[in-house]
C-alpha cells in the first residue's frame, strides 16, 4: 500500500540567477517567498505493484462479468429477461443473454469467477483494450495530454476496420467518423454521434485517474478529450466520476477499505451537477444502501425508479432503444453503485454483486475490479483468491498492430504506466521524482495556506 508520509520542505529565496543543477533531494526553490510546502510521498515500487493489481483485478472482474453480460435487463419492450439475479444464483447455471440464442455463456456453465492460470493468457476485451491503447499512446508520444490527431491516428492504427472489432455503439460511431477525417472531440458530438449517452467513455478512460495520483482535477484534464471522443453531457460527467475515483485511490488514509471506498465515492460525487440524473442516482443508491436493505432490493428499486418510472429526468425508456438502452451510461452507472456500496471494498464481494446486478455486468465489475485491484495490489489479489494467476495479456484478441504479436505482460504494462505517471508527476502536477529513494513527492499546498 502507499505510505502517506508527509514531508515538509523549505522553499528558499533565490538570491542570484546562478544555473546550478538542483540536487536529487527533497528541496525545491521559490524565487518569491519563503514558505513550507507539504509533500505526499509515494513509493514508485509500490505504485508499480498497484498498477499490476489494476490490470490483474480488471481482467478477473471483466471476464467474470462477461458470463452474465446482458442476461438480465428487465421486462420493458420487446426483449424481456424475467426476474433479476440474486445472491442465490451465484454458482448456479448461467442463463442465456439477450443475444445468446438460448445458450448460456461459453466462458463458464455456471455463474462463477473466471480465472486464467499461470500457463494461460488473459484476453483483451472492450473494457481493457482502449485503456491499453491510450497508455501505449501516452508512452509512445511521451505526452501527458494527447492531441486530437494522436487519438484519431491511434484508433485507426490499432482498431480493426472490417472484421469483428469489439467496439460498442458510441465507440463504433466515433471510429466511423474518424475514418471520414473527423477529429475528436467532434466524434462525440451529439450532432454527429447519436450514441453519445451510452456507456462507451467509461470503458476507455478510468485509467487516466491512475496517471495523476491524488490529483483528480489533473486526471480529468488528461481524460477530457478521450472522454469527449465518444460522450457528452451526463455520460461525460459519469466518466469523470470514475476517473476521479481512480485518482483518489492513491490516498491511503489508514482507514479500512470500506471507509476509503465510501470517502472516495463521496468526494467523486462532487463532479456530478446536483440537478443531473447521475447525481440523483448516486444520492438515491447511497440512501438505500445506508438504510440497510439488501443489495437486490436496491437494484430492483433503481430499475423501477429509472427504467419503469423514468424519474429524475432519466428518459431512456421513452426513446424505444434496442434492449431498452441496456447499454446506456445511466442505468449501468446506477448498477455500478450497487456493487460499489455493498461490496464495501472487498474485491470478491464487489465482483459477485456486480456480476449479478444486471445489464452490462462486465463493465461495472471491470471498473471496480481494476480500482480495488489497484488499491490492494498483486499480492492482495492473490491473497483474496488464495491462488496465482497468469501475468500475460493478449491485446491482439481485440486490437492490432502492437509489438510482440500483441502478447504483453502485466509487469511490462505496469512499467509503462509508471513511466507515464513519472511524466505527469513532473510536468503536470509539479512534483519531484526522488531517484535515490525511488519516491514521488506530490505537492499538496503550502503549509501556511492550510486551514
Regions found by a protein language model. Give the residues of each.
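Accessory "access/gating" subregions that flank catalytic or transport cores
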Residues: 39-42, 174-196, 205-215, 224-229, ...
Amino acid at each position: 500500500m502507499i505510505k502517506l508520509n508527509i514531508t515538509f520542505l523549505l522553499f528558499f529565496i533565490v538570491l542570484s540567477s546562478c544555473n546550478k543543477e538542483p540536487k536529487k533531494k527533497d528541496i525545491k526553490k521559490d524565487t518569491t517567498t519563503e514558505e513550507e510546502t507539504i509533500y505526499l510521498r509515494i513509493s514508485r515500487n509500490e505504485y508499480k505493484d498497484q498498477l499490476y493489481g489494476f490490470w490483474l483485478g480488471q481482467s478477473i472482474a471483466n471476464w467474470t462479468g462477461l458470463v452474465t453480460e446482458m442476461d438480465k435487463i428487465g421486462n420493458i419492450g420487446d426483449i424481456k429477461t424475467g426476474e433479476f439475479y440474486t445472491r442465490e444464483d451465484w454458482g448456479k447455471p448461467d442463463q442465456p443473454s439477450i443475444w445468446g440464442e438460448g445458450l448460456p455463456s461459453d466462458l463458464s456453465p455456471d455463474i462463477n469467477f473466471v480465472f486464467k492460470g499461470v500457463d494461460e493468457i488473459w484476453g483483451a476485451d472492450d473494457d481493457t483494450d482502449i485503456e491499453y491503447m491510450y497508455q501505449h499512446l501516452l508512452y509512445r508520444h511521451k505526452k501527458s495530454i494527447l492531441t486530437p490527431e494522436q487519438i484519431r491516428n491511434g484508433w485507426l492504427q490499432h482498431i480493426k476496420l472490417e472484421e469483428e472489432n469489439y467496439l460498442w455503439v458510441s465507440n463504433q460511431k466515433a471510429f466511423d467518423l474518424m475514418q471520414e477525417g473527423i477529429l475528436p472531440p467532434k466524434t462525440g458530438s451529439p450532432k454527429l454521434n447519436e450514441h453519445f449517452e451510452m456507456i462507451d467513455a467509461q470503458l476507455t478512460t478510468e485509467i487516466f485517474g491512475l496517471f495523476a495520483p491524488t490529483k483528480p482535477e489533473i486526471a480529468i484534464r488528461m481524460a477530457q478529450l478521450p472522454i469527449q471522443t465518444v460522450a457528452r453531457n451526463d455520460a461525460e460527467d459519469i466518466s469523470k466520476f470514475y476517473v476521479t475515483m481512480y485518482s483518489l485511490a492513491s490516498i491511503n488514509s489508514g482507514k479500512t477499505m470500506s471507509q476509503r471506498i465510501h470517502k472516495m465515492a463521496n468526494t467523486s460525487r462532487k463532479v456530478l451537477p446536483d440537478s443531473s440524473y447521475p447525481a440523483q442516482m448516486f444520492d438515491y443508491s447511497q440512501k438505500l444502501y445506508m438504510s440497510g436493505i439488501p443489495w437486490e432490493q436496491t437494484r430492483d428499486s433503481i430499475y423501477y425508479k429509472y427504467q419503469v418510472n423514468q424519474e429524475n429526468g432519466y428518459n431512456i425508456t421513452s426513446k424505444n432503444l434496442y434492449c431498452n438502452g441496456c447499454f446506456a451510461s445511466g442505468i449501468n452507472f446506477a448498477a455500478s453503485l450497487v456493487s460499489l456500496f455493498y461490496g464495501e471494498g472487498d474485491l470478491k464481494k464487489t465482483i459477485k454483486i456486480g456480476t449479478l446486478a444486471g445489464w452490462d455486468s462486465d463493465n461495472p465489475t471491470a471498473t471496480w475490479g481494476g480500482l480495488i485491484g489497484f488499491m490492494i495490489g498483486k499480492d492482495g489479489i492473490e491473497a483474496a483468491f488464495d491462488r496465482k494467476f497468469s501475468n500475460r495479456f493478449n491485446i491482439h484478441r481485440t486490437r492490432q498492430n502492437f509489438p510482440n504479436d500483441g502478447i504483453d505482460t502485466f509487469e511490462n504494462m505496469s512499467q509503462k504506466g509508471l513511466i507515464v505517471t513519472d511524466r505527469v508527476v513532473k510536468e503536470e502536477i509539479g512534483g519531484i521524482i526522488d531517484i535515490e529513494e525511488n519516491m514521488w513527492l506530490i505537492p499538496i499546498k503550502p503549509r501556511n495556506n492550510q486551514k
